[in-house]
C-alpha cells in the first residue's frame, strides 16, 4: 500500500509540474508581447526625434506623420526595394507638428505653433506640459472639464480671445483659467467681459504699527477687534442721528422771550443749545468719537493726499464741523451775558445780525444730517446704491432734462388755457411750474387744479407724458442696480467658498514603471500573506513538521527580496523628482522607464530561478522520504509525503 501511495503521489507531482510549465510559458509569451510593444513605442519616438532633427537642419517645417505601416514595420521600402526616404515639405511657418491633447477622454488636435504663441502658459511651455505627457499613447492627458477646454483651445487659436461657454459656470471656468496658467492679463480681461469691474488696489502703510491701525479702522473683516470698532462706529452714528431728530420735538425745545415794545413780548425758539442740555452732552460724546476716528485714520493712512480727496472722508469732516461752530456760538453767548461795556447798536442792525446768525445756525444743523452717509462705510447696500447712481448719471441727466422740457411745455399750456377763468390758480407760468412737476411725477397734491375744460385736457396730457417720461430711463437704472448687486453677491460667494475640483495626475518621470512595480509588489506580498496564513491554518502542520521547515526558507527569502525592491523604488522616485523637468525630453523620459522595467524583469527572473532551485531541493527531499516510507511500510509516512508534495506544489503555483 505504501508503494502504491508513493506512485500516486508522484503522478500528482508530474501533473502539477506540467501545469507549472504551461503557466511559465504563458508568462513568457506575455513578456515577449510587452517587449514588442515597447520596441514599437521606442521606434516611434526615434522617428519623431529624427524628424525634429531634420527640421532643425533643413529649416523647414516638420515632416508629415508616418502611416501605421511605416511606424509598425520600421523603415519601409520603396518601389525599387531600397529604403524609403521622407523628404521635408517646405513650409512658410515653423512648428507645424500636430499635438494631441486628451481632456477626460475627449481628444483635441492642434498645431504646435498654435500653442507656442503663448509660451508663458501651461500648454505653451514645453517643460510644463511635459509633466502631463503619456509616451505610450503619444498624447497629453488632462483630467479637467471638457466643455471648458473648447474655450481654452480657442484662446490659443484666436490669439488671445477668451469666451466662456454658456453651459459652463463662472466659477468652474475661472478655475480652468488658473489651472492652464493663462496669466493675470487673461483673467482680468475675462472678468471685464463678464461685467466685473476691476477694483483699484488699495495700498497699505509700510510701517507695521500704522498698518495694524489702518486695518483696524478701515477693514472690519480683517480681525475680531476691527469688527468691534466697526460696531461701535455704527452705534455712535445711529445715536447721533437719533439725537438730531429727537431734539426737534416741542417738549425738548428751548424758547426765548423778547420785549419788542413797551407792553409787547415775542417768544422765539432758541437756536443755540445750552451746555447743560443732555442732547448737547450726548452730541459732544459722539463728536469726540468721530474726531478720534478721523484723526487716527488720517495719521495711519498710506497717502494723505488721497485720503483728503476721498468723498467719505469729506463727509466725515462735514459731519464734525457744525459741532465746533455751534460750540463757538455757545461760548460767544456766554461772553455776552457778562456785564461788559459794549458799543451801542441800532435795533435794525441787531435784528439783521440775529436773523443772519439764526440762518447760519440752521444751515449748520442741517449739515448734521449728512452723518447718515457715514453708514455707507459699513453697509454693502448703501455702497451698491451709490455705485448704481454713479453709473446711472447719464440716465438721471436724461430724466431731469425730459422733465424740464415737460414742465416748461405744460406749465405754459395750462397758463394760457386757464387765462380766461376767474377762479384760476395759475397766476403766471413760473407759478405753474409746481403744478407741472407734481402732475408729471403722478403725485398730485391738489393744491393747484385746472378749472376749465381746456385746462383739464392739458392736465391729462401732462400726467400721461409724465408717466412715459419717467418710465423710459427707470429700467436702465434698475438693471444697473441688479448688475452691481449680483456682482457683489457673486464675489462674496467666490471668496467664501473653496472649490475643490479634481486635479490632473501628471505623468512624472518614472510613474509608468512605478505603477507596475508597486502593483506587482503588493500582489506578491498579499500572496505571501495568504500562503503564510494557509500554512498556519493547515491541520497537523506544527513547528516540527517537515512542511513547515520547507516553507520557512522560502518565506524568508521573499521577505528579504521585498525590502530592497521597495527601498530601490523609493530611491529611484526621489532621484527622478530631484531632476529638473525642464531638462528632460520625451526620449530621455521613455529611456528611463525602459531601464526601470528592464531591472524589474531581471529581478523577476532571478527570483524565479531561486524558486525553481528551492523546489528541486524540496522534490528530492520528498522523493527520499517516499522511498523510506515504502521500505518501512508505514501508512502514516506515506500520507505525510503526499501532504508535503501537495504543499510544495501549491507553493510553486502561487509563486
Swiss-Prot record:
Voltage-gated potassium channel that mediates transmembrane potassium transport in excitable membranes. The channel alternates between opened and closed conformations in response to the voltage difference across the membrane. Forms rapidly inactivating tetrameric potassium-selective channels through which potassium ions pass in accordance with their electrochemical gradient and may contribute to A-type currents. Plays a role in the regulation of sleep need or efficiency. Plays a role in sexual behavior, where it is important for male sex discrimination. Residues 430-441, 442-449 dip into the membrane without crossing it. Expressed in mushroom body (at protein level); this overlaps with expression of qvr/quiver/sleepless and nicotinic acetylcholine receptor (nAChRs) proteins also involved in sleep regulation. Expressed in the adult brain. Enriched in the mushroom body, anterior optic tubercle, superior protocerebrum, antennal nerve and visual projection neuron fibers projecting into the lobula plate of the optic lobe. Residues 380-393 are annotated as: S4-S5 linker. Pfam families: BTB_2, Ion_trans. The keyword NAD does not apply. InterPro entries: BTB/POZ_dom, Ion_trans_dom, K_chnl_volt-dep_Kv, K_chnl_volt-dep_Kv1, SKP1/BTB/POZ_sf, T1-type_BTB, VG_K_chnl, Volt_channel_dom_sf. GO terms for cellular component: membrane; membrane raft; neuron projection; perikaryon; voltage-gated potassium channel complex. One of its GO terms (molecular function) is voltage-gated potassium channel activity. This is Potassium voltage-gated channel protein Shaker. The lineage of its organism: Eukaryota, Metazoa, Ecdysozoa, Arthropoda, Hexapoda. Residues 247-278, 333-357, 416-429, 450-456 are extracellular. A motif (Selectivity filter) lies at residues 442-447. Residues 1-87, 515-548 are annotated as: Disordered. The keyword Ribonucleoprotein does not apply. It is found in: Cell membrane; Membrane raft; Cell projection, Neuron projection; Perikaryon. Its main location: membrane.
Amino acid at each position: 500500500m505504501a508503494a502504491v501511495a508513493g506512485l500516486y503521489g508522484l503522478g500528482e507531482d508530474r501533473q502539477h509540474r506540467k501545469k507549472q510549465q504551461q503557466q511559465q510559458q504563458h508568462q513568457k509569451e506575455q513578456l515577449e508581447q510587452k517587449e514588442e510593444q515597447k520596441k514599437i513605442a521606442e521606434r516611434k519616438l526615434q522617428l519623431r526625434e529624427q524628424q525634429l532633427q531634420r527640421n532643425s537642419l533643413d529649416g523647414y517645417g516638420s515632416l508629415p506623420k508616418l502611416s501605421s505601416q511605416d511606424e509598425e514595420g520600421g523603415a519601409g521600402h520603396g518601389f525599387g526595394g531600397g529604403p524609403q526616404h521622407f523628404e521635408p515639405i517646405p513650409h512658410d511657418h515653423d512648428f507645424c507638428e500636430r499635438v494631441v491633447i486628451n481632456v477626460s477622454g475627449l481628444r483635441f488636435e492642434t498645431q504646435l505653433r498654435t500653442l507656442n504663441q503663448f509660451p508663458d502658459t501651461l500648454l505653451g511651455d514645453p517643460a510644463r506640459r511635459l509633466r502631463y505627457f503619456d509616451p505610450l499613447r503619444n498624447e497629453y492627458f488632462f483630467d479637467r472639464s471638457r466643455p471648458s477646454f473648447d474655450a481654452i483651445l480657442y484662446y490659443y487659436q484666436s490669439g488671445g480671445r477668451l469666451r466662456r461657454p454658456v453651459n459652463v459656470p463662472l466659477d468652474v471656468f475661472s478655475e480652468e483659467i488658473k489651472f492652464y496658467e493663462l496669466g493675470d492679463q487673461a483673467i482680468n480681461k475675462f472678468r471685464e467681459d463678464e461685467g466685473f469691474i476691476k477694483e483699484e488696489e488699495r495700498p497699505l502703510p509700510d510701517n507695521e504699527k500704522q498698518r495694524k491701525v489702518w486695518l483696524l479702522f478701515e477693514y472690519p473683516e480683517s480681525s475680531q477687534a476691527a469688527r468691534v470698532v466697526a460696531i461701535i462706529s455704527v452705534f455712535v452714528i445711529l445715536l447721533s442721528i437719533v439725537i438730531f431728530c429727537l431734539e426737534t420735538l416741542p417738549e425738548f425745545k428751548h424758547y426765548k422771550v423778547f420785549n419788542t415794545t413797551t407792553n409787547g413780548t415775542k417768544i422765539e425758539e432758541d437756536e443755540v443749545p445750552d451746555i447743560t442740555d443732555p442732547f448737547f452732552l450726548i452730541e459732544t460724546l459722539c463728536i469726540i468719537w468721530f474726531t478720534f476716528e478721523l484723526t487716527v485714520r488720517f495719521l495711519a493712512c498710506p497717502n494723505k493726499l488721497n485720503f483728503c480727496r476721498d468723498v467719505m472722508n469729506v463727509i466725515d469732516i462735514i459731519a464734525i464741523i457744525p459741532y465746533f461752530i455751534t460750540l463757538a456760538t455757545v461760548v460767544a453767548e456766554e461772553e455776552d451775558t457778562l456785564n461788559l461795556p459794549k458799543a451801542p447798536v441800532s435795533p435794525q442792525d441787531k435784528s439783521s445780525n440775529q436773523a443772519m446768525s439764526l440762518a447760519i445756525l440752521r444751515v449748520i444743523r442741517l449739515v448734521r444730517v449728512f452723518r447718515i452717509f457715514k453708514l455707507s462705510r459699513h453697509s454693502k447696500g448703501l455702497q451698491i446704491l451709490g455705485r448704481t447712481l454713479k453709473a446711472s448719471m447719464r440716465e438721471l441727466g436724461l430724466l431731469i432734462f425730459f422733465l424740464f422740457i415737460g414742465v416748461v411745455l405744460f406749465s405754459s399750456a395750462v397758463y394760457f388755457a386757464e387765462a380766461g377763468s376767474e377762479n384760476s390758480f395759475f397766476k403766471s407760468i413760473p407759478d405753474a411750474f409746481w403744478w407741472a412737476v407734481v402732475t408729471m411725477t403722478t403725485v398730485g397734491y391738489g393744491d393747484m387744479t385746472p378749472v376749465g375744460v381746456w385746462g383739464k385736457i392739458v392736465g391729462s396730457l401732462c400726467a400721461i407724458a409724465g408717466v412715459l417720461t419717467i418710465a423710459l430711463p427707470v429700467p436702465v437704472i434698475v438693471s444697473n442696480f441688479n448688475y452691481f448687486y449680483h456682482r457683489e453677491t457673486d464675489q462674496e460667494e467666490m471668496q467664501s467658498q473653496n472649490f475643490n475640483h479634481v486635479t490632473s495626475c501628471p505623468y512624472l518621470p518614472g510613474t509608468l514603471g512605478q505603477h507596475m512595480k508597486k502593483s506587482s509588489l503588493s500582489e506578491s506580498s498579499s500572496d505571501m500573506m495568504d500562503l503564510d496564513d494557509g500554512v498556519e491554518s493547515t491541520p497537523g502542520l506544527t513547528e516540527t513538521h517537515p512542511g513547515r521547515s520547507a516553507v520557512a526558507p522560502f518565506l524568508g527569502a521573499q521577505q528579504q527580496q521585498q525590502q530592497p525592491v521597495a527601498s530601490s523604488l523609493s530611491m529611484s522616485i526621489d532621484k527622478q523628482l530631484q531632476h529638473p523637468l525642464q531638462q528632460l525630453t520625451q526620449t530621455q523620459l521613455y529611456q528611463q522607464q525602459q531601464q526601470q522595467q528592464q531591472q524589474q524583469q531581471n529581478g523577476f527572473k532571478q527570483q524565479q530561478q531561486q524558486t525553481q532551485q528551492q523546489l528541486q531541493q524540496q522534490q528530492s527531499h520528498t522523493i527520499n522520504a517516499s522511498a523510506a516510507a515504502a521500505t518501512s511500510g508505514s501508512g502514516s509516512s506515506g500520507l505525510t509525503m503526499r501532504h508535503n508534495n501537495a504543499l510544495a506544489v501549491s507553493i510553486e503555483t502561487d509563486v
